[in-house]
Amino acid sequence: MRKLLNTLYVTTPERYLALDGENVLVLEEKKILIRLPLHNLEGIVTFGYTGVSPALMGACAKRGISLSFMNPNGQFLASVSGENKGNVILRKQQYRISDSLEDSIPIARNMIIGKIYNSKWVLERATRDHALQVDVDAIKKVTANLDEHIRQLLECDSMDRIRGIEGNAASQYFSVFDQLILQNKEEFFFENRNRRPPLDNVNAMLLFAYTLLANECAVALTAVGLDAYVGFLHTDRPGRISLALDLMEELRAVYADRFVLTLINKKTIKPEHFVKKENGAVLMNDTGRKTMISAWQGRKRDKIKHPFLGDKIEWGLIPHVQALLLARLIRGDLDEYPVFLWK
């Protein structure tokens, strides 16, 4: 099993990254703030424009360390990767499946079944753990509808229909999402999904969590030899990591949404961690991003039992395991994609 290493997140735009021997340096105005051995890292994510030295880019590419660039708001800009050592036959088969609706539909269908199942689990967990604080009847009505969406998917053989069911299910799920926010509801409330830009604190947190998750899915797919830009459910678009977006669908609710809710309900994230722009956009400030990233790294260390493998592994390895299982399906070693179903 792959070892879970650390990811270095650089959230302050003024920081510059450089190489010193076998170490990465984080500098500000030529002053060394952090020195970390490269062999302890599996990825570097930087939120800013100051830059990274060509020497460090080359060292990361050579060692297979992912290097991703985001703008200060968390929007993906670019990534640096080295030689793809995956089997070219695997990627050619991935492209064939992507071009074939008949072959893509079963994979996309399983991924969306997983997304809806896990969304339902998050809601059911809330009614079990917080029955006196949530509207149990309203949530149960939604979970019954989600069950019906899963039944519809089991018989669905149209990609457009799969996308339509997914959209309806997401709308149902988010219609009661505000029920799951139990603390500081004056500042943390949810009315609807808005993302470009986020217009409230909760949507700002969801956007940031989804950005982190999408990046980790892209890194995992690349590591197993797949092309993160060629998906089955999400169509090809220049610059879009379509397969990473496919893979993260089943993980959104249990990996990202629950994480955001935990930070709010435990009061880890506070109202002062956000800034509101003149255009109404609400963004996390530097302190908020650092707090969220620190908690994200801790969450990745938690152990769970993988529902398909039966092994206890760290949460942070789930994207990698699912990428491996997807690669096995594409190679023909599995009959269907074993979507992650949290129990």
Residue spans for each PLM region:
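Active-site helix-to-loop segments that bind/position phosphate- or nucleotide-bearing substrates
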Residues: M1-L19, E29, R35, N87-Y229, ...
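Terminal-proximal segments
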Residues: M1-P72, G82
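A surface-exposed, charged beta-strand/loop segment in the N-terminal or early-internal portion
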Residues: N40, G48-W121
